[in-house]
Amino acid sequence: MTEFSPREIVSELDRFIVGHPEAKRAVAVALRNRWRRRRVPDDLRDEVTPKNILMIGPTGVGKTEIARRLAKLAQAPFLKVEATKFTEVGYVGRDVDQIVRDLVESAIQMVREKRRAAVRARAEAAAEERILDALTGPGSTAAREAFRRKLRAGELDDKEVELQLADTSSPFGAMDIPGQPGASMGVLNLGDMFGKAFGGRTKTHKTTVSGAWVPLIAEESDKLVDQEALTQEALELAENQGIVFLDEIDKVASRQDRAGADVSREGVQRDLLPLIEGTTVSTKHGPVKTDHILFIASGAFHVAKPSDLLPELQGRLPIRVELKALSRQDMRRILTEPEANLIRQHQALLATEGVTLTFTEDAIDALADAAVAVNGSVENIGARRLQTILEKVLEEVSFTAADRDGETITVDAAYVNGRIGDLAGNADLSKFIL
């Protein structure tokens, strides 16, 4: 779990996301509260529940990006899911309990990587012995040492070897649950049960020495790691530090002015209630309590309003954060300020062809103006409009870059307006092209 202070979390998010200080502060405090809860006396720890967050803001302002960056910062099991993927229990589709199962898988992967790293040195030594066995056979000490020196020097990387690796696949293949796409694992994963019954099987793999290291180190690491303790730690991690980001929550809100059966929409909300409030979900690794999992819900709420959500669900998302629509100045900053901004990405892509791409200040102004103009006249899709416009402006350059090695291309306002000036001004054309 990360030990950043709220101020450090906000400054870290500022490196990648422009604006929205309130949303950044809310997620920073929520993340820090996870750290604080672990230091609270035992008798109070179970009583401290996370304050779930509802982010409200138009599309393309950075709600999902905040979640993505938070996932990297959190160093905790993190899952981002779209609420629209789920249906009410009893209908064809995935039910919301799958969220917790996926979170547990994420936690297991995290703990496995951490434990593998702890035994990596021993696993590498064992993997080296197995590669030498494949190259020289189990005996021949003198030849083995000569091969060991060559192996460590990298002289044998291209040599082909035959390895016996554990076959973890089930002899019966994947078993999907009918009517639930992707739900091949549940409380009883038959594939796993039968796979273990036929355990101890190996499979012959032909590969180069350099390609053999990764599977061998993984296999040797897993032999050194206590799998039961790993699962137990992962379940505890998911229960106490898990974070779930529920995107597109507005799409399962039923509008009050709409008549008709919205069964599966409202049903998803009703199914989410116990999950967010706190319940126990059965997974193939064991039961998981959701009382202390932090839920961050977000939605554009273009058509529905937050008040269209079930009152009980609104009550379970006590912290409300509103993200404002992006201004022209925000658009300009998005093009230049974030570490992996769009302009830098395009410059790096074209640099691989030997083309140097530069943008003047007035070109950046023209791009921001065009994005704001099209968002205002057609449909406001926020910062995503910049991608569309930039692709259109650089279309010709990207196409001919392979023939322009060594050239420097300067993009100025005249260049930008020459490519998209007429389109941005014509609402009918913008609808189809920008």
UniProtKB/Swiss-Prot annotation:
CDD domains per the UniProt record, alphabetical? RecA-like_HslU
Its name, as the record gives it, is: ATP-dependent protease ATPase subunit HslU
The record's listing under PANTHER family reads:
ATP-DEPENDENT CLP PROTEASE ATP-BINDING SUBUNIT CLPX-LIKE, MITOCHONDRIAL-RELATED (PTHR48102), ATP-DEPENDENT PROTEASE ATPASE SUBUNIT HSLU (PTHR48102:SF3)
Q: What is its main location?
A: cytoplasm
Q: Which Pfam families match?
A: AAA (PF00004), AAA_2 (PF07724), ClpB_D2-small (PF10431)
Q: Which HAMAP family match?
A: HslU (MF_00249)
A GO molecular function annotation here is: ATP hydrolysis activity
Transmembrane feature ranges = none
Instruction: State where the protein is found.
Output: Cytoplasm
Record's function text: ATPase subunit of a proteasome-like degradation complex; this subunit has chaperone activity. The binding of ATP and its subsequent hydrolysis by HslU are essential for unfolding of protein substrates subsequently hydrolyzed by HslV. HslU recognizes the N-terminal part of its protein substrates and unfolds these before they are guided to HslV for hydrolysis.
Q: Where does ATP bind?
A: 18, 60-65, 247, 312, 384
Give the gene that encodes this protein. hslU
Q: Name one GO biological process term.
A: protein unfolding
Q: Name one GO cellular component term.
A: HslUV protease complex
Subunit structure comment from the entry: A double ring-shaped homohexamer of HslV is capped on each side by a ring-shaped HslU homohexamer. The assembly of the HslU/HslV complex is dependent on binding of ATP.
Identify its protein family: Belongs to the ClpX chaperone family. HslU subfamily.
Instruction: State the NCBIfam families in the record.
Output: hslU, PRK05201.1
